[in-house]
A protein has these predicted regions:
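FIC/Doc superfamily catalytic core
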Residues: 1-139
Length: 139
């Protein structure tokens, strides 16, 4: 083992001994980051700090729409449900995917009336129409 490896192992050992790892909830940090970045793709402007206040303290972000905040809350709850479901090592089913979809869209979903019929994204209904990316985007 060379000196760099020894120094690296020494630093790692001191880090573990410091207990920092026990002071930071990395799973929670990862979840909040995942939710923040996932909803940003959908247009949310809520920051990780604002989500932390919303999720941990129930403090809403000033100047952010209720729709944005509910999108973040719903996605967090859906992720937690999905993590719990994965621990049980259950099979994927259409019913499970519909339930998960309903959790994601719980407060922000809407009813649609299209050529193929009617469906409600807040209920986890399967889409009866094409999906496009932006105005005029291809399906």
């Amino acid at each position: 083992m060379n000196s760099i490896d020894k120094r690296l192992l020494d630093v790692l050992e001191r880090y573990i001994a410091s207990g920092i790892e026990q002071q930071v909830d990395y799973e929670k940090f990862y979840l909040y980051s995942l939710v923040t970045h996932s909803t940003a793709i959908e247009g949310s402007t809520i920051t990780e700090v604002e989500n932390q206040l919303l999720f941990d303290e129930g403090i809403v972000a000033k100047g952010r729409s209720i729709n944005e905040q509910m999108m973040n809350v719903d996605l967090k709850n859906a992720y937690l449900y999905g993590f719990e479901w994965a621990q049980k090592m259950q099979l994927y089913t259409v019913d499970f995917l519909r339930q998960l979809s309903a959790m994601v869209m719980r407060r922000t979903g809407t009813k649609y009336s299209v050529v193929g019929g009617e469906f409600d994204s807040a209920q986890g209904d399967l889409r009866l129409c094409n999906v496009s990316a932006g105005v005029g985007g291809s399906s």
